[in-house]
Each structure stands twice: as structure tokens, then as C-alpha cells.
UniProtKB/Swiss-Prot annotation:
GO terms for molecular function: phosphoglycerate mutase activity. Its EC number is 5.4.2.11. This is 2,3-bisphosphoglycerate-dependent phosphoglycerate mutase. It catalyses: (2R)-2-phosphoglycerate = (2R)-3-phosphoglycerate. Catalyzes the interconversion of 2-phosphoglycerate and 3-phosphoglycerate. Keywords: Gluconeogenesis, Glycolysis, Isomerase.
Length: 237
């Protein structure tokens, strides 16, 4: 018997997604296409009869605005929303803002793929005086220095999400609340890794499209019964 459903969604296409640039913690907004994707996601959820009790998102506007558009389509703009830096995208360090094709030409396909897809390899860190460091951003002012990365591996991203997932999100799901999480490609990959206990190889192969709801159905022990993309024709990922 299904106890509950969880909805995960990666933000709609951002301006830097469109320009093929590393984004990470840089606060870039949705592109025109991204806004369309977010509204379409809201319409799909409405057609499927979804309503929610609580929403989570990151502190980055591309995810926040995606959630806005979805909740507006659902006529649930009033819904309680918690924003957390722990749901941010992976921090890509000194790669942030750089074009992926140009970086590939400079460093080679193998090196760039290691930075992007491996579990434990960290991209080049921001330097100590780089103004892109989170310590210069007011939204992170209450965090300790050891919580603020200069760059992150995928494993580091997963590790920062684990306490938030276990301490904040999972208890709501256990309590029967209907939850939606609007986040980022790598933070959603981290959550899916926790839900499905993915192997390293499975995680590396997992890609999350922009603006498409992922539905998880659970039993009474919060074990996954099934998961699928919500689209005109539903399919497993």
C-alpha cells in the first residue's frame, strides 16, 4: 500500500545552462525556456492531481523561481517553503562561469569528465581572495567557515545533504506529509542516491533533465515502490 509520494524536480533551464557554462553556486536565473519548463511542470503536476503540504528548495534563484512557477500553476503559492544552502548545486570552484567546451579544449575530455562525473575528484578550488567565495555572500553569513566550500566533489555534495535529508525532510515524509523539492542536478542526484542506495557507477551514469518532475512512491517503511518521470507518457528513469 502506498503511503506517500515525493516529488523531486531540477530547476528549469538557466541562462548559463543555455550558454553551456559551469554554474554551481553562482546565482543565475532561469532562461525563457526554463520558465516555460517550470510552468509546464506545474501543469503536469496539476493534471496528475498533486497537492503538497510542504516544499523545499535551495537558496539559489533558479530553483526558487522554478518552485514559484510550479506552485502558482497549482494555486498553492501560499505553501510553506524552506530554503536551505544544503540543497544548493555542487560547488564547481574555479570552473564556475567558464564555458564547458572551452575548458574541454584547454584541459582535455578525460580531465573535464573526471571533474564533472567522478565521485571523489574535486574541481580546481577558488583562491582565498576570490570574490566568488561564499564567505563574501550575505546569504551564507550565518554559516561557519568549515561549511563553506571552495569547490566540491560529488561525494562532498552528498555528505552535506545527508544531515538535512535525515533531520528535516525525511521526518516530514515519515509523518505522511506531501513534499516537493525543487533543487539542482547534483543535489537531486544525491537524494536519489540516498533513496535508492545507488552504487558509484550507477550514480555516475545518472543524469537529471531540467524541469521534469520525478515521482517517488513509498510503502509504509518509506521504501521505494517505484519512481518515474512525470510526463505525457510516464517512464522510469
Amino acid at each position: 500500500m502506498t503511503l506517500n509520494k515525493l516529488v523531486l524536480i531540477r530547476h528549469g533551464e538557466s541562462k548559463w545552462n543555455n550558454e553551456n557554462r559551469f554554474t554551481g553556486w553562482t546565482d543565475i536565473d532561469l532562461s525563457d525556456q526554463g520558465r516555460i519548463e517550470a510552468k509546464n511542470a506545474g501543469q503536469l503536476l496539476k493534471q496528475a492531481g498533486f497537492i503538497f503540504d510542504f516544499a523545499y528548495t535551495s537558496v539559489l534563484k533558479r530553483a526558487i523561481h522554478t518552485l514559484w512557477y510550479i506552485l502558482d500553476e497549482l494555486d498553492q503559492a501560499w505553501l510553506p517553503v524552506e530554503k536551505s544552502w544544503r540543497l544548493n548545486e555542487r560547488h564547481y570552484g574555479a570552473l564556475q562561469g567558464l564555458n564547458k567546451k572551452k575548458i574541454t579544449v584547454e584541459y582535455g575530455e578525460e580531465q573535464v569528465q573526471q571533474w564533472r562525473r567522478s565521485l571523489n575528484i574535486t574541481p580546481p578550488e577558488l583562491s582565498d581572495n576570490d570574490k566568488r567565495l561564499p564567505i563574501y555572500d550575505i546569504r551564507y553569513a550565518k554559516l561557519s567557515l568549515d561549511q563553506l566550500p571552495k569547490a566540491e566533489s560529488l561525494a562532498m555534495t552528498i555528505n552535506r545533504i545527508i544531515p538535512y535529508w535525515k533531520g528535516e525532510i525525511l521526518p516530514r515524509i515519515n509523518n505522511g506529509e506531501r513534499v516537493i523539492i525543487a533543487a539542482h542536478g547534483n543535489s537531486i542526484r544525491a537524494i536519489i542516491t540516498l533513496l535508492d542506495q545507488l552504487s558509484e557507477n550507477e550514480l555516475i551514469q545518472l543524469n537529471i533533465p531540467t524541469g521534469v518532475p520525478i515521482i517517488y512512491e513509498f510503502n509504509s517503511q518509506i521504501k521505494t515502490i517505484k519512481h518515474y518521470y512525470l510526463s505525457i507518457v510516464n517512464k522510469d528513469y
